[in-house]
């Protein structure tokens, strides 16, 4: 099963790079590998490149907490959005003390969602759990972005898409960088991105193949005998 991240260790003092470029899920098979990747970093710097539409909230929250724990040991994390950081991926992006966003990238914040099956009591308990997770994520937005609870509640009330400039203004990003050409490893169709966001991932139309020049077909050669026959038929 392919993990939702790739890890590249760098020699010497160069930052290690962790690329999160898939939907976040199947956490039970990846938690140990993610932790092992962090524990194996010899550099004091880590760059986390993010291009994800989100996924399982507890998986992403686990990633965020591991990254913050790693940074709290006196190390430096830079998060860099390379396309989109949506849903729980937006929380992971906030794990960096330096948070870079190219000018044509986006973040999306919204409320926690989940499903449940069972009795009415089971459904009420599930709703209570969702509410508690919602508060936990709201507190992260408040703490890392420097906004108040009312603003965090407002942007989480619906799918709130933020441009890189808006992210800088609101404290989600700390630095804007030059625009990039983004590619998506996740399923763009299933992600249901707004058109202005999906355009980031659309490559320019490839130039059309040059029209091959065709030589005119040669005139049919009429043999004298054929010409005589034609005259007889007229």
Language-model regions: role of each:
Residues 1-88, 95-234:
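N-terminal organellar transit peptides
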């Amino acid at each position: 099963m392919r993990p939702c991240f790739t890890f590249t260790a760098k020699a010497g003092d160069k930052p290690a790079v962790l690329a999160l470029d898939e939907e976040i899920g199947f956490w039970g098979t990846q938690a140990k590998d993610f932790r092992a990747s962090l524990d194996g970093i010899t550099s004091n710097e880590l760059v986390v490149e993010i291009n994800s539409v989100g996924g399982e909230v507890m998986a992403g929250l686990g990633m965020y907490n591991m990254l913050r724990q790693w940074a709290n040991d006196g190390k430096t994390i830079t998060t860099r959005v390379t396309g989109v950081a949506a849903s729980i991926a937006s929380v992971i992006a906030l794990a960096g003390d330096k948070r870079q966003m190219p000018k044509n990238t986006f973040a999306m914040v919204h409320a926690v969602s989940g499903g449940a099956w069972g009795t009415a009591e089971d459904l009420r308990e599930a709703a209570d759990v969702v509410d508690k997770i919602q508060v936990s994520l709201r507190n992260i937005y408040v703490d890392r972005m420097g906004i108040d609870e009312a603003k965090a509640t407002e942007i989480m009330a619906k799918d709130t898409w933020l441009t890189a400039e808006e992210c800088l203004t609101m404290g989600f990003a700390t630095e804007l960088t030059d625009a990039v050409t983004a590619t998506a490893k996740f399923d763009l169709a299933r992600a249901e991105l707004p058109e202005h966001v999906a355009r980031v991932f659309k490559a320019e139309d490839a130039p059309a193949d040059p029209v091959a020049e065709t030589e005119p077909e040669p005139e049919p050669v009429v043999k004298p005998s054929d010409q005589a026959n034609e005259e007889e038929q007229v």
